[in-house]
């Protein structure tokens, strides 16, 4: 048994700000909280907040998950994002061959078996997408679902699974089948009309991937997928708040429209995070990094160079969202989405929760990241 007494001079526990809290952490889990500051192992003078949870991470630290997926690559990506406060992530495989999907699943199974800190499951973004809204995904690899994909998706050793799909390319029966397997189904890269999207939600889809991006827009006569996302209070949407993917006013509109918890922050991060890379290969093209914006040679946005710390700062400072709500959008709300049918173990710093913590300075930059009571 390992025990640590951690003194937070100021703590945001997921619900409110409190001062002089001492967290007793046993084997990585918060077992008690008191105010006896005489007997502590660690003193923190910054603001201690719940660790950030990113449900859409393609890469980081110079590595792209799609490029020869392995557990070492997962560790590289996780390490890069941990520096910016991410304590749990869903490594994301974009549209690729089924053989690469299987390799990614093998890497995830190994990471789960080895208890690699911060790796909680896998997000398959594609390949069952709309060609009309493919973005930077490879058109030649977009395809209907087959038995080969079902073999990968049905595995029980790869942690939580998220699948992003276009509902016009996948039947409602297949969506329901995924949900029964415990898969979280998100709608994205879709040109579906409102009716088709709504049928997918009725069949069990509960999320929308990078809201506003690569989906049919809202207009007066056709609400589209965006309208479906905003109208259904029982769904949650990921939002990229980097100033490139979505106008800040549109971000504000979505947050005001959805009930509390309806929007969570994601990065859609690519290899440049944590590096000074200016370009990198993706499929058969090159992606260029300029002023934080990633653009492929064919002109599309190609993911982001965003980290979760910057996403939180942008949400608070650019969108004028209260700090406590911006922090929930990076921790509590993605945890609620991920663990909707189970007892959550992340997202708050309360008794019984995993001790995933981030220490911030006055500018909301990350000073320390702790995963399971261990500094990383």
Predicted regions and their residues:
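Active-site gating loops and adjacent loop-to-helix segments of metal-dependent hydrolytic enzymes
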Residues: 58, 79-90, 131-156, 199-211, ...
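Alpha-helical scaffold segments that flank or form the walls of functional sites
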Residues: 47-48, 55, 66-118, 141-155, ...
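His/Asp/Glu-enriched, well-ordered alpha-helical/loop segment
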Residues: 228-237, 255-267, 273-360
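N-terminal metal-binding scaffold of metallo-dependent hydrolase/deaminase domains
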Residues: 1-37, 370, 374-375
């Amino acid at each position: 048994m390992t025990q640590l007494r951690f003194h937070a001079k100021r703590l945001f526990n997921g619900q409110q700000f409190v001062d002089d809290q001492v967290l007793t952490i046993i084997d990585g889990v918060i077992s008690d909280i008191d105010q006896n500051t005489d007997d502590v192992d660690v003193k923190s003078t910054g603001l201690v907040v719940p660790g950030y949870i990113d449900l859409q991470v393609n890469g980081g630290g110079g590595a792209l998950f799609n490029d020869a997926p392995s557990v070492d690559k997962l560790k590289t990506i996780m390490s890069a994002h941990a520096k910016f406060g991410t304590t749990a992530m869903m490594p994301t495989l974009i549209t690729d061959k089924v053989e690469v999907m299987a390799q990614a699943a093998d890497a995830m199974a190994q990471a789960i078996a080895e208890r690699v800190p911060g790796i909680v499951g896998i997000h398959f973004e594609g390949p069952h997408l709309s060609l009309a809204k493919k973005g930077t995904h490879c058109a030649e690899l977009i395809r209907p679902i087959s038995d080969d994909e079902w073999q990968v998706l049905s595995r029980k050793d790869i942690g939580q699974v998220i699948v992003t799909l276009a509902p016009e390319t996948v039947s409602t029966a297949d969506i329901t089948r995924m949900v029964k397997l415990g898969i979280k189904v998100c709608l994205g890269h879709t040109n579906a009309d409102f009716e088709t999207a709504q049928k997918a939600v009725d069949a069990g889809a509960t999320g929308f991937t990078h809201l506003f991006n690569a989906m049919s827009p809202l207009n007066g006569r056709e609400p589209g997928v965006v309208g479906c996302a905003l109208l259904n209070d029982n769904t949650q949407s990921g939002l990229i708040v980097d100033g490139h993917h979505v106008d800040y006013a549109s971000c504000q509109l979505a947050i005001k429209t959805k009930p509390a918890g309806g929007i969570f922050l994601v990065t859609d991060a690519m290899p440049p995070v944590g590096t000074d890379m200016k370009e990198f290969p993706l499929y058969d093209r090159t992606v260029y990094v300029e002023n934080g914006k990633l653009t492929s040679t064919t002109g599309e946005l190609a993911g982001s160079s965003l980290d979760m710390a910057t996403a939180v700062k942008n949400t608070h400072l650019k969108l004028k969202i209260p700090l406590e709500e911006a922090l929930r959008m990076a921790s509590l709300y993605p945890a609620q989405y991920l663990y909707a049918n189970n007892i959550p173990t992340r997202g708050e710093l309360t008794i019984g929760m995993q001790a995933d913590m981030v220490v911030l300075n006055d500018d909301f930059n990350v000073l320390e990241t702790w995963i399971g009571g261990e500094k990383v």
